[in-house]
Amino acid sequence: MRVVLLGPPGAGKGTQAQLISEKFGIPQISTGDLFRSNISEGTELGLQAKQYLDAGDLVPSEVTNKMVEARLDEPDAAAGFILDGFPRTVDQADALAAMEEARGVTIDAVLEFRVPVEELVQRLLGRGRADDTEDIIRNRLNVYRDETAPLLEYYQNVLQTIDAVGTVDEVFARTSQALGR
């Protein structure tokens, strides 16, 4: 099973990805984790990513795409994976489609986790991170909306929307149902 998870910061993608990974025995692939591991291992891609992250910039798609592709080539991803935080743009979705085509596979499901904006703001404020002021959070949500909205159309044939309000178990029940399991 090959699954893409979409949703704004605070929607619970990481939590749901972890549960899907445990239930179906497929790896959760998070771009944040890929950045951290490549940086800590001192890989060429990690060094490139670090320059952008240290400057407070987004890592360019070219670097992110190469990291994801290398991760998809690892043996544990052969039977399936969950992508959490990738793709974020149509360009990245096109790159993923090319990776799939090269491997003779397709994405089985794209799940969009929806949560009302005010709920997201409260969830993110509740994390207690120093850099999570309400203004910064609202800006992150706007950036997400603007850059990711075109993906909803891109994936319209495989997209399923999940109501991500409720307990972790309630949302996972909806997620499992959407995956047909």
UniProtKB/Swiss-Prot annotation:
E.C. number(s) listed in UniProt: 2.7.4.3
PANTHER family membership: NUCLEOTIDE KINASE
Assembly description: Monomer.
Gene label: adk
Protein name: Adenylate kinase
Pfam families, A to Z: ADK
Binding site for AMP: 31, 36, 57-59, 85-88, 92, 129, 140
GO molecular function annotation: adenylate kinase activity; ATP binding
Gene3D superfamilies documented for this protein: P-loop containing nucleotide triphosphate hydrolases
Pathway: Purine metabolism; AMP biosynthesis via salvage pathway; AMP from ADP: step 1/1
Domain remark from Swiss-Prot or TrEMBL: Consists of three domains, a large central CORE domain and two small peripheral domains, NMPbind and LID, which undergo movements during catalysis. The LID domain closes over the site of phosphoryl transfer upon ATP binding. Assembling and dissambling the active center during each catalytic cycle provides an effective means to prevent ATP hydrolysis.
Origin organism lineage: Bacteria, Bacillati, Actinomycetota, Actinomycetes, Mycobacteriales
